Amino acid sequence: SAGHIIGSAQIYLEYKGEVVIISGDYKRRKDATCAPFEVKKCHTFITEATFGLPIFTHPEDKQEAKKIIKSMENNKEYCHLIGVYALGKCQRLITILRELGFNDIIYLHGALMKISEYYKERKINLGIIKNISELRTNEYAGKLILCPPSSLSDRWSQKFRNVIKGFVSGWMSIKQRVKQKNIELPIVISDHADWNE
């Protein structure tokens, strides 16, 4: 396993006693949604380098997820609209929030539902998740709603009033990206290895 997302894998090649491993996307951090990264002895390791610079030292995942919970506690009249990638990041964020004791219903954009149901079928505990279409506009206050990042700035998101927009990505450690995307609640959680990993 590469520990990146569910089903991720490394490529292991052996020829005449020489072993080469090609990591593909990977991370070394604990993740309840996928098998952990497998360390294998090799002569050559070909790594991804999405965050392969010293400036990318990601904070602890649970500390970042706590920012969402704290913001919700401090801003009960607002809905929290959080951008997450549909495969992996959505489900990982949900499991981290559940581990932190957040047991409220988490509402999902329709584009996130099918993949999340797949994770649930694989016995990954996401708690209660529902499609956002089950809520009326006047019921958004105080709710946590996850959506694809592109939805944060398209017509779909215009129906939300009193909203705090967040985005969960390793790229949220770059202040210019946060500003460009008009994100109020940047959450630095990545499915890729950082510099120290």
Identify the meaning behind each predicted range.
Residues 1-34, 75, 130-161, 165, ...:
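Core dinuclear metal-dependent hydrolase active-site scaffold
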